[in-house]
């Protein structure tokens, strides 16, 4: 399991799976303050790269 810090780093580098995971973390408030706006932004970044799960979040 990756730490939130690692997920943030990889997501910022453009990895769609990490972006989706970060969206999940923000949506559910896992290890970070719940923020639906940021969740949407991270899901959108992943979805724009073709990440299928993110396209439905």
Outline where the language-model segments fall.
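Hydrophobic face of amphipathic alpha-helices that form TPR/SEL1-like repeat modules
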Residues: 21-28, 32, 55-57
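Intrinsically disordered, low-complexity repeat tracts enriched in Gly/Pro/Ser/Thr and acidic residues
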Residues: 1-2, 11
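Conserved hydrophobic/aromatic "anchor" residues
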Residues: 26, 42-43
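Short helix-capping/linker turns of helical repeat alpha-solenoids
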Residues: 12-15, 28-30, 35, 48-52
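Generic short amphipathic/hydrophobic targeting helices enriched at N-termini
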Residues: 4-6, 28
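Short, contiguous, well-ordered secondary-structure segments
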Residues: 15, 20-21
């Amino acid at each position: 399991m990756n730490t939130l810090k690692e997920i943030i780093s990889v997501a910022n580098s453009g990895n769609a799976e990490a972006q989706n995971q970060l969206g999940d973390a923000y949506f559910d408030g896992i290890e970070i303050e719940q923020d639906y706006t940021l969740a949407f932004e991270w899901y959108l970044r992943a979805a724009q790269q073709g990440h299928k799960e993110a396209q439905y979040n």
